[in-house]
């Protein structure tokens, strides 16, 4: 055994374990503080039980600004941006996606979605503990 139980507890004390359920339509983030038996899901709006994050991005028209999740859906419905769905499938297939005559790498877009959605954890835990 590399560590005994006391040493292991010191090493991991305060550490946070993160689970990410990346789905085609919706994604969800959960976390648990090491040593506790409670798993929490990350709400997209603080104080609510809205845990599903639409797995989409939206590029705002005319600018290089990307929105994710519910904001992406909202902007696309208001016709203020271009919605990119099927992020996982597009990343698997490779190739480029063209929006407003500009090419985008689907793997980079999926990575952007992951980074933006994982930022929701900043409201719950510090990045150093993950």
Q: Model features per residue range: what roles?
A:
Residues 1-96:
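Early-domain small/polar-rich strand-loop-helix modules and first-structured segments
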Residues 103-114:
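Phosphate/oxyanion-binding active-site loops and adjacent basic polyanion-contact surfaces
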Residues 117-130:
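Phosphate/pyrophosphate-binding loops at sites that engage ATP/ADP/AMP, CoA/4′-phosphopantetheine
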